């Protein structure tokens, strides 16, 4: 078939110089395979060797990074210590005699003069120590010596800190570590140290200069832009004045809340002094104003005039909006300073500053006292108050904080720290004695521990103040229920499906399981048409609702009927009921009467069985212990009283200097939170004289409710704020700003939802985020 192909002779003669046979080809292929196999084996050995070297280099990388990081930490720690000691010296020297002042000043100046020879010795010692440390980790990468006159590339001369930084740069440079965030931080930090006159200034320490210099940096300009945006967001409340409804008169017996006072805005998660913002003398105050109820409330005259504004509530989970009437820190003006309730002995501001300056962070884990970029002091109240406080107290984060530290905070705590956030310059002046509020350049605290003898001390928050199971992160508004009248009472069903809102002459029922529903599922007309509902309570079975308000009768509604209906009415001698409470067994109802009595009703027989008499003015709020044995009531006579329900007698009485508008008893026992007309929230221990006093509200506290887990509670006020607090010391968990006075609130049994009723004729539903 293939005669030409089977005739090999011409091909061999013409094109092939050797004989082509199959065995030879196989031998040649075998030789080539063996050669490739040997080459593969050689490459494999080389690859394994490179992998081993790579592992070794990674070990060196980690070792030198840790050394460099540790040196950076130590350098900043020593720098901060030097600044604080310099500040203390500057404060103490004026107390010396003139002769000693000069001697001490000269000694301080001599101590600042570090010669190049001393720096060379320091650098040499540090390098030798680093080499000794590296011997235990395999052959060290050789360290390049840095003469005293030469600086590492890209880093400006750093004065007295050159030795440490030169060493850390040598370590990182030889192992090819380009840690840009660290270098930026060093440049920013030491640029301030290099300012002319800084090292020779005794009376104006470096820590006081840093903030003025930072004002020219990009972080400060960004902060100003952020503030302007916040100001625009907040100023639209004021522009809604033309759209506000007519004044609504609410008949509320014997109430007399004062009008909102000038109160400050500050970072609620911090409770201490902000050393970074000492003496910002040139800081310009950007105009900002916040909406608060435009009218005053009068319970004494039986009228509560609410000038409300129709605007969407704005949730601010961190910082209240700044007020334009607040003084800039560093100035002597202190408008809005209110006299304190207690009068503790005067505290020497010099001693205070020294003590505050020498404090260390309360909650910084890890091998070093504070991460780089942080100001390592806890202030008077422990600014490092949250999980993220290990790297930044969330609101007091240094603008030079590196990305590595931020990432570490996220990994460790699951929350992204608010990098670059700077609190507004308008500092709050809370209701505290001037000697506590007036710490020079200090950021006012808002949580104070008050001892039995009236001593007030800012509270250092523990490291788990804002973390842990059952502690929310923030709250998100998910629904608005347009009731149509001022909502003075709200309650949530169990399980969470229906919300009941009490307004003028009726209670409306809303189904919140379908967020799209914008209209109530039913309306319960009760009391008189023009009388406001002041309280409504569901029995645990969810089938009975009790309603009280500006009438002498309480309405009992049967919700299990095909159409809700009134199944009974309870009539008392008092003209109004301000608050209701139900016993855990659902057998008894307690009503706070405008005449000061506490009426006890038998719900089964629908009769009045007892009255607790003691309040000399209207009883405004009430709560009952979980075991049903103890009742707590607050009154317009400035007292909080506890009652033994088994024996029918008064147990305790707490006297205050302000009317009591709201209270709540912690479900887990021991703590009672009280909301005041004076804008304070006080948390009392039921068996001890000690208490906590909280100062974030700017006007009277109108309602208060504990979460069912007992770990936190919320309060609302005439200042349009909803505040969430940690039990009992009052670390601020989150804060929401609504568009009008927030008159009432409730928390669902599963602690997942909060409902508030406000003066702009609506209720707001929040989802609690954990």
Swiss-Prot record:
SUPFAM superfamilies documented for this protein: WD40 repeat-like (SSF50978)
Motif Nuclear localization signal: chain residues: 225-228
Organs and tissues of expression: In all tissues examined, mostly in brain, liver and muscle.
Low complexity composition-biased segments: 257-266, 284-298
CDD domains assigned: WD40
Sequence segments annotated as region (CcN domain): 200-268
Region ranges (Q domain): 1-131
A GO molecular function held by the record: transcription corepressor activity
Effect recorded for residue 486 to S: Abolishes HESX1 binding
Amino acid composition bias (Basic and acidic residues), ranges on this chain: 178-196, 209-246, 267-283, 300-310
InterPro entries: Groucho/TLE_N (IPR005617), Groucho_enhance (IPR009146), WD40/YVTN_repeat-like_dom_sf (IPR015943), WD40_repeat_CS (IPR019775), WD40_repeat_dom_sf (IPR036322), WD40_rpt (IPR001680)
Any GO CC annotation of this UniProt entry: transcription regulator complex
Residues modified to Phosphoserine: 239, 259, 263, 267, 286
UniProt-listed GO biological process terms: animal organ morphogenesis; negative regulation of anoikis; negative regulation of canonical NF-kappaB signal transduction; negative regulation of canonical Wnt signaling pathway; negative regulation of DNA-templated transcription; negative regulation of Wnt signaling pathway; positive regulation of gene expression; signal transduction
Post-translational modification: Phosphorylated, probably by CDK1. The degree of phosphorylation varies throughout the cell cycle, and is highest at the G2/M transition. Becomes hyperphosphorylated in response to cell differentiation and interaction with HES1 or RUNX1. Ubiquitinated by XIAP/BIRC4.
Entry-linked PANTHER family: TRANSDUCIN-LIKE ENHANCER PROTEIN, TRANSDUCIN-LIKE ENHANCER PROTEIN 1
Family, as annotated: Belongs to the WD repeat Groucho/TLE family.
UniProt protein name: Transducin-like enhancer protein 1
Gene name for this UniProt entry: TLE1
């Amino acid at each position: 078939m293939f005669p030409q192909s089977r005739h090999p002779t011409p091909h061999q003669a013409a094109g092939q110089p050797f004989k082509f046979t199959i065995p030879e080809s196989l031998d040649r292929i075998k030789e080539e395979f063996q050669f490739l196999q040997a080459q593969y084996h050689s490459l494999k050995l080389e690859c394994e060797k490179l992998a081993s070297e790579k592992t070794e280099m990674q070990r060196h990388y980690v070792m030198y990074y840790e050394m460099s990081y540790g040196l950076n930490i130590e350098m900043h720690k020593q720098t901060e210590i030097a600044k604080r000691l310099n500040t203390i010296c500057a404060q103490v020297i004026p107390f010396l005699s003139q002769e000693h002042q000069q001697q001490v000043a000269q000694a301080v100046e001599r101590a600042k003069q570090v010669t190049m020879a001393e720096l060379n010795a320091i650098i040499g010692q540090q390098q030798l120590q680093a080499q000794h440390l590296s011997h235990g980790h395999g052959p060290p990468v050789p360290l390049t010596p840095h003469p005293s006159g030469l600086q590492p590339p890209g880093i400006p001369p750093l004065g007295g800190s050159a030795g440490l930084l030169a060493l850390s740069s040598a370590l990182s440079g030889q192992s090819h570590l380009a840690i840009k965030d660290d270098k930026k931080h060093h440049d920013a930090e030491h640029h301030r140290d290099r300012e002319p006159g800084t090292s020779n200034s005794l009376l104006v320490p470096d820590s006081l200069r840093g903030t003025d210099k930072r004002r020219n940096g990009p972080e400060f300009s960004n902060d100003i832009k952020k503030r302007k945006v916040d100001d625009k967001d907040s100023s639209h409340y004021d522009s809604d004045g033309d759209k506000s409804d007519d004044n609504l008169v609410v008949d509320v017996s014997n109430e007399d809340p004062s009008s909102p006072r000038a109160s400050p805005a500050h970072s609620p998660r911090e409770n201490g002094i902000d050393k970074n913002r000492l003496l910002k003398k040139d800081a310009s105050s950007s105009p900002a104003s916040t909406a608060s109820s435009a009218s005053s409330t009068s319970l004494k005259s039986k009228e509560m005039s609410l000038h409300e504004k129709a605007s969407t509530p704005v949730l601010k989970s961190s910082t209240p909006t700044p007020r334009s009437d607040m003084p800039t820190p560093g100035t002597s003006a202190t408008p809005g300073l209110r006299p304190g309730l207690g009068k503790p002995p005067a505290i020497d501001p010099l001693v205070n500053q020294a003590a505050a300056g020498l404090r260390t962070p309360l909650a910084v884990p890890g091998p070093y006292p504070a991460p780089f970029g942080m100001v390592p002091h806890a202030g008077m109240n422990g600014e490092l108050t949250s999980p993220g406080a290990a790297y930044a107290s969330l609101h007091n984060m240094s603008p030079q904080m590196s990305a590595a530290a931020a990432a570490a905070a996220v990994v460790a705590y699951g929350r992204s720290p608010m990098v670059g956030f700077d609190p507004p310059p308008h500092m709050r002046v809370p209701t505290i004695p001037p000697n506590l509020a007036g710490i020079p350049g200090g950021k006012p605290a808002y949580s104070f521990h008050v001892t039995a003898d009236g001593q007030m001390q800012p509270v250092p928050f523990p490291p788990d103040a804002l973390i842990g199971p059952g502690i929310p992160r923030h709250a998100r508004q998910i629904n608005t229920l347009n009731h149509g009248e001022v909502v003075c009472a709200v309650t949530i069903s169990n399980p969470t499906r229906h919300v009941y809102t009490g307004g003028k002459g009726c209670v409306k029922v809303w189904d919140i399981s379908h967020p799209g529903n914008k209209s109530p599922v039913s309306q319960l007309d009760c009391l008189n048409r023009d009388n406001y509902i002041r309280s409504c309570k569901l029995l645990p079975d969810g089938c009975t609702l009790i309603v009280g308000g500006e009438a002498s009768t309480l309405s009992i509604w049967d919700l299990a009927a095909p159409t809700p209906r009134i199944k009974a009415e309870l009539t008392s001698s008092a003209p109004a009921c301000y608050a209701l409470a139900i016993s855990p067994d659902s057998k008894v109802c307690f009503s706070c009467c405008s005449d000061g009595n506490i009426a006890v009703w038998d719900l089964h027989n629908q009769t009045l069985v007892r009255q607790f008499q003691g309040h000399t003015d209207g009883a405004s709020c009430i709560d009952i212990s979980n075991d049903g044995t103890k009742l707590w009531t607050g009154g317009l006579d400035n007292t909080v009283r506890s009652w033994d329900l088994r024996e029918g007698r008064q147990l305790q009485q707490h006297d205050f200097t302000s009317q009591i508008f709201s209270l709540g008893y912690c479900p887990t026992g021991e703590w009672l939170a009280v909301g005041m007309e004076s804008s304070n929230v006080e948390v009392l221990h039921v068996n001890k004289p000690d208490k906590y006093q909280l100062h974030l509200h700017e006007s009277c506290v109108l309602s208060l409710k504990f979460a069912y887990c007992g770990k936190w509670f919320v309060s609302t006020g005439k200042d349009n704020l909803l505040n969430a607090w940690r039990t009992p010391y009052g670390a601020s968990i989150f804060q929401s700003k609504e568009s009008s006075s927030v008159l009432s609130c409730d928390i669902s049994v599963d602690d997942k939802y909060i409902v508030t009723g406000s003066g702009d004729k609506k209720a707001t539903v929040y989802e609690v985020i954990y």
